[in-house]
């Protein structure tokens, strides 16, 4: 068996410098062709000592830029340095900018959404421009119905709900004490109580429109001044004090109604404001009373003669149906009585100011008003039309024919120069910080619909009466004005801030005024009175609850008040 020999390991011979220290002056031939390059500045390979550049150790600052210190790049050789040549044959420009990441699908969707929004805004803008005031007011119908329901609850509609308060919740606030329109005397007997909440379910459909009675149209009207339509908050007009006569003639004192009753025309008689008060009874909050005379087979709805300018039926209430109506006997200017008087003077002056008083007007068949004062002969600025309606058969089987005295306030030229009749009314702003009002001077020009909705909410009963008066008179258009105090603490000076046209039929729909329901309420009251024997009766709205009570009055009741008022009027004339 052959044995294998391992290679021998031989150590290289080390050169020994016997003549001194340090490396030999001559190197081995095996390492001469190998270049040396210091790859790391921290390599401990270099000179052991440098006795030549001693003066460089004394340099300071920037003078030491070329100093070869340990670990400096100056100690490295240049064997592996890159030397840039001038060869530009292979030179290329490289774009080092970062490319933007694009999502074309996303950009398309964004542009499409933006376009849709722009188109939607354009459509909404056109709708707002083309939308009339009547359409905008329809948005307030739901709020109006909700408010009416809350008011019904607040007035005791939910009294049977256990311990719940009048506000429909536990611990609700009690209703404010309201005064009755007339003090009920012990000798007055209660014949019937009519719940106003049940009136909302009544309906008398298919009542034809009113018919003018012969030539019984009296007075003359002035044409409306269309320059008033340019009035705005920025271009307001001071409310002038216009002279004129206001006639407050009751039903039984009207000579035309007396003539018609004697001539057998109609069997139920009343004025437009009295009938409107009965037909809008569920909306009223304050107390009012109407005298009913049952004479033979005829019924007269009349009002009491009071010492005040206006009867509670004719009072232009202010913020009656608001959440916090003004009190009757409050101190200052903003009590209910003074506000109603202020509203009366505002309406009288407004309806005279907005017509052309110095120009020829429109004259009816009878120029002279039947109850006009022969001595003064002052024009009232109001025309009177006597109209009649057929309300079907009554409780006795005979037809119920209603005769009503209606009022018109002006005329205007319509399409084709046709003369149209006007009913002119005015809202009055007293203090926007009270009774849930809004500041007209900031919102009226830009949000007239919101201001109108607020007025309908706070004055539901008054607005409904105005609308019914226009419908009973057959008025073509209603002209509504917005009159505000110049100073909230003074009732002396006012300004007209804006005006507005509405059609009575459309406006009635906007305020949820159903004529079938109104005729049903009136017919119910007529039937209740016609069931009684001939005599004198009183219909009074309870001040605290939604109830109308029918009282029987002894003979001679209220006659002393009428005599005293007539004596005062005669003393004033003297």
From Swiss-Prot:
Residue stretches of biased makeup (Low complexity): 154-163
Annotated S-S bridges: none
An individual GO BP term: formation of cytoplasmic translation initiation complex
Region Disordered, residue ranges: 153-178, 555-574
Region described as RNA gate: 312-326
This protein's domain notes: The RNA gate region regulates mRNA cap recognition to prevent promiscuous mRNA-binding before assembly of eif3d into the full eukaryotic translation initiation factor 3 (eIF-3) complex.
Function as written in the Swiss-Prot or TrEMBL entry: mRNA cap-binding component of the eukaryotic translation initiation factor 3 (eIF-3) complex, which is involved in protein synthesis of a specialized repertoire of mRNAs and, together with other initiation factors, stimulates binding of mRNA and methionyl-tRNAi to the 40S ribosome. The eIF-3 complex specifically targets and initiates translation of a subset of mRNAs involved in cell proliferation. In the eIF-3 complex, eif3d specifically recognizes and binds the 7-methylguanosine cap of a subset of mRNAs.
PANTHER family: EUKARYOTIC TRANSLATION INITIATION FACTOR 3 SUBUNIT 7 (PTHR12399), EUKARYOTIC TRANSLATION INITIATION FACTOR 3 SUBUNIT D (PTHR12399:SF0)
Protein name: Eukaryotic translation initiation factor 3 subunit D
Species of provenance: Caenorhabditis briggsae
């Amino acid at each position: 068996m052959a044995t294998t020999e391992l290679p021998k390991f031989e150590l290289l011979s080390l050169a020994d410098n016997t003549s001194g220290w340090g490396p030999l002056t001559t190197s081995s031939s095996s390492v001469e062709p190998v270049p040396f390059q210091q790859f790391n500045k921290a390599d401990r390979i270099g000179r052991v000592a440098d006795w030549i550049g001693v003066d460089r150790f004394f340099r300071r600052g920037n003078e030491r830029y070329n100093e070869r210190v340990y670990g400096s790049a100056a100690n490295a050789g240049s064997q592996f340095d890159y030397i840039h040549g001038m060869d530009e044959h292979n030179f290329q420009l490289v774009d080092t900018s970062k490319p933007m990441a694009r999502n074309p699908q996303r950009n398309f969707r964004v542009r499409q959404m933006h376009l849709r929004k722009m188109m939607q805004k354009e459509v909404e803008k056109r709708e707002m421009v083309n939308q009339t005031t009547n359409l905008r007011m329809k948005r307030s119908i739901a709020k109006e119905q909700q408010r009416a329901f809350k008011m019904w609850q607040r007035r005791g509609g939910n009294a049977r709900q256990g311990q719940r308060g009048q506000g429909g919740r536990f611990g609700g606030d009690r209703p404010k004490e309201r005064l009755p329109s007339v003090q009920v005397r012990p000798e007055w007997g209660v014949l019937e109580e009519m719940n106003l909440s049940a009136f909302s379910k009544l309906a008398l459909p298919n009542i034809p429109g009113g018919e003018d009675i012969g030539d019984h149209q009296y007075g003359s009207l002035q044409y409306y001044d269309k320059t008033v339509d340019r009035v705005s908050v920025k271009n307001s007009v001071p409310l002038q004090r216009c002279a004129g006569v206001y006639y407050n003639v009751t039903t039984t004192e009207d000579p035309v109604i007396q003539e018609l009753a004697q001539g057998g025309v109609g069997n139920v008689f009343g004025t437009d404001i009295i009938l409107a008060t009965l037909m809008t009874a569920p909306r009223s909050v304050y107390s009012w009373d109407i005298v009913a005379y049952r004479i033979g087979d005829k019924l007269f709805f009349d009002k009491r003669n009071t010492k005040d300018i206006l009867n509670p039926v004719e009072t232009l209430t202010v913020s009656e149906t608001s959440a916090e109506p003004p009190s009757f006997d409050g101190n200052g200017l903003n009590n209910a009585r003074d506000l109603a008087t202020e509203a009366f003077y505002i309406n009288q002056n407004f309806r005279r100011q907005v017509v052309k008083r110095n120009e020829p007007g429109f004259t009816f068949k009878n120029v002279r008003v039947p109850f006009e004062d022969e001595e003064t002969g002052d024009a009232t600025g109001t025309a009177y039309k006597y109209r009649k309606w057929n309300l079907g058969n009554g409780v006795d089987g005979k037809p119920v024919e209603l005769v009503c005295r209606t009022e018109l306030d002006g005329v205007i030229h319509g399409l084709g120069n046709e003369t149209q009749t006007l009913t002119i009314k005015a809202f009055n702003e007293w203090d926007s910080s009270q009774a849930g009002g809004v500041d007209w001077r900031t919102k009226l020009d830009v949000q007239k619909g919101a201001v109108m909705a607020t007025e309908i909410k706070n004055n539901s009963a008054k607005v409904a009466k105005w609308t019914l008066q226009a419908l009973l008179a057959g008025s073509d258009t209603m002209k509504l004005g917005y009159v505000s105090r110049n100073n909230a603490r003074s009732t002396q000076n006012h300004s007209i801030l804006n005006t507005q046209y509405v059609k009575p039929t459309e406006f009635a729909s906007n305020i949820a005024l159903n004529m079938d329901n109104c005729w049903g309420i009136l017919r119910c009251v007529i039937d209740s009175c016609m069931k009684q024997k001939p005599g004198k009766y009183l219909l009074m709205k309870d001040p605290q609850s939604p109830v109308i009570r029918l009282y029987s009055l002894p003979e001679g009741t209220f006659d002393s008040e009428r005599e005293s008022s007539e004596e005062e009027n005669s003393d004033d004339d003297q």
